[in-house]
């Protein structure tokens, strides 16, 4: 069912916009970060991971960001290119800004943390002049990362992209993607998140992220239904609110809602599932699936990622996700995540 109409004449399917980083995941797990001696390098950052996830699922993907003008920047550009992602709109930082670095700590399957270096960061240097109207026009949808709204000039660039998308019937998917270290205060988060959300067609985020977005207009925490109704009232077609291990719910503009639970899986780490969830869910709605099927697909992809060492490198293909779902249903029953 087409809850959202995408312009099928456009050559690109999706353009994620914003953060791309380098992840260093420890090879020695179940120990503190200070005791880890060796790491494996991966591409990271939510928009970067979502781009890779969608490309693995067969979508035609572009990417709009700024990366460092050094070896790590080369790594990111080459990695995305090798995944079949269009790199024509990836810019290079001009004043020595670097890619963000993320070191992960895996103390146990349920206890993980991340250490981020985000000072003088390249992706926040994307300027409004580097946002091509023709490029945004060429895509069926863009994915805006909340982190891209946190600092200038990236903030202004993101809103220019939003304006171009509205002008040219390019659908807007807003991934709240909150990272505390990039914002000055909670009021700033609420203002800029709300402005972007009022322009979006789909919003995806955790309950905590929605609370931050609604901090000024609703000082008392809203329940999920109230939150969904608020943002659907501004024109969104789908609002997805995630509750971690308790699952997630998609609220639709026609008043219906669908809930999905996580697939049972042996965890390796407690991070990385959200980007896989987003890419697989976006794939499902772009394919015209029922929302419950898109949610199930997203939940399956997320489960596969939290059982893997990496994020971007482990992004699955369509048949791999379908096989995972088939096996889990054979083991646990047809309604394993829908009941």
Curated annotation (Swiss-Prot):
This is 5-dehydro-2-deoxygluconokinase. One of its GO terms (molecular function) is 5-dehydro-2-deoxygluconokinase activity. Gene3D superfamilies: 3.40.1190.20, putative 5-dehydro-2- deoxygluconokinase (2.20.150.10). Keywords: ATP-binding, Kinase, Nucleotide-binding, Transferase. The gene is iolC. SUPFAM superfamilies: Ribokinase-like. Catalyzes the phosphorylation of 5-dehydro-2-deoxy-D-gluconate (2-deoxy-5-keto-D-gluconate or DKG) to 6-phospho-5-dehydro-2-deoxy-D-gluconate (DKGP). It comes from the Bacteria. Pathway: Polyol metabolism; myo-inositol degradation into acetyl-CoA; acetyl-CoA from myo-inositol: step 5/7. It comes from Clostridium tetani (strain Massachusetts / E88). It is an enzyme of class 2 (transferase). The keyword Nucleotide-binding applies. Its EC number is 2.7.1.92.
């Amino acid at each position: 069912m087409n809850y959202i109409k995408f312009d099928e004449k456009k050559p690109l399917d999706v353009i994620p916009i914003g953060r791309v980083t380098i992840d260093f995941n420890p090879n020695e797990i179940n120990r503190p970060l200070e005791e880890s001696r060796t790491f494996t390098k991966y591409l990271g950052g939510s928009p970067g991971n979502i781009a890779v996830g969608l490309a693995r699922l067969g979508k035609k993907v572009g990417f709009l960001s700024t990366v460092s003008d050094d070896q790590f920047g080369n790594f990111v550009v080459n990695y995305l290119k090798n995944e079949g992602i269009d790199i024509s709109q990836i810019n290079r930082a001009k004043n020595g800004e670097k890619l963000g670095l993320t070191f992960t700590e895996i103390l146990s399957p349920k206890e993980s943390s991340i250490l981020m270096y985000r000072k003088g960061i390249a992706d926040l240097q994307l300027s409004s002049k580097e946002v091509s109207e023709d490029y945004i026009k060429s895509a069926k949808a863009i994915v805006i990362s909340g982190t891209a709204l946190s600092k200038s000039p990236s903030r202004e660039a993101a809103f220019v992209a939003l304006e171009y998308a509205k002008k040219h019937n390019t659908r807007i998917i807003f991934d709240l993607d909150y990272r505390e270290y990039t914002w000055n205060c909670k009021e700033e988060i609420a203002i800029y998140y709300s402005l972007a959300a009022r322009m979006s067609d789909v919003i995806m985020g955790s309950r905590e992220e929605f609370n931050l977005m609604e901090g000024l207009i609703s000082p008392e925490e809203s329940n999920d239904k109230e939150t969904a109704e608020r943002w659907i009232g501004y024109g969104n077609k789908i609002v997805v609110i995630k509750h971690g291990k308790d699952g997630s719910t998609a609220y639709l503009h026609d008043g219906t809602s669908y809930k999905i639970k996580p697939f049972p899986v042996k965890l390796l780490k407690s991070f990385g599932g959200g980007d896989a969830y987003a890419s697989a869910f976006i794939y499902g709605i772009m394919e015209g699936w029922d929302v419950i099927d898109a949610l199930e697909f997203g939940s399956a992809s997320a489960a596969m990622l939290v059982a893997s060492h990496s994020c971007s490198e482990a992004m699955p293909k369509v048949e791999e996700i379908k096989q995972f779902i088939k096996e889990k249903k054979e083991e646990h029953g047809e309604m394993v995540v829908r009941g």
